[in-house]
């Protein structure tokens, strides 16, 4: 009997780990999307999802999104996650973004920035959205 309960419990745990994780839903703020003739028109190769951390001690996610919208000719990514789990879209996923070197840019259909913060609660919300967005992006573009 004990063996049967153990096997049942292990089967249940295994099944739970194989299910998709969608307990946290993020929303995308499109306020800072690049305009029609802004950003690269070159389609990126589906090799990597590029993950960055801003390393900016004082900027909010919103500030970073505004900066990238203004500076798109030199640096921008598809998304910036910050301000308690808000996902700001700047560039168009699937196209080259200018968040890394030329090889990484050409081979990353999605680049995501994470707001730097020392606040634990903000970090936890940001990180949940960051990981979920990275996972969803990898699935969308067939990246293991």
Residue ranges and their predicted role:
Residues 2-106:
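N-terminal catalytic cores of peptidoglycan-degrading enzymes
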């Amino acid at each position: 009997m004990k063996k049967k309960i153990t096997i049942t419990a292990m089967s249940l745990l295994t099944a739970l780990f194989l299910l998709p994780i969608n307990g946290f839903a993020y929303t995308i703020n499109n306020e800072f999307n690049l305009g029609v003739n802004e950003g690269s028109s070159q389609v990126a190769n589906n090799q990597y999802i590029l993950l960055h951390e801003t390393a900016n001690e004082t900027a909010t996610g919103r500030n970073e999104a505004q900066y990238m919208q203004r500076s798109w000719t030199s640096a921008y990514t598809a998304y910036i996650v910050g301000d308690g789990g808000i996902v700001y879209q700047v560039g168009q996923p699937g196209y080259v973004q200018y968040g890394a070197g030329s090889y990484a840019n050409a081979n990353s259909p999605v680049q995501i920035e994470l707001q730097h913060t020392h606040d634990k609660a903000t970090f936890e919300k940001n990180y949940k959205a960051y990981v979920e967005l990275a996972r969803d992006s990898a699935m969308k573009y067939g990246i293991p």
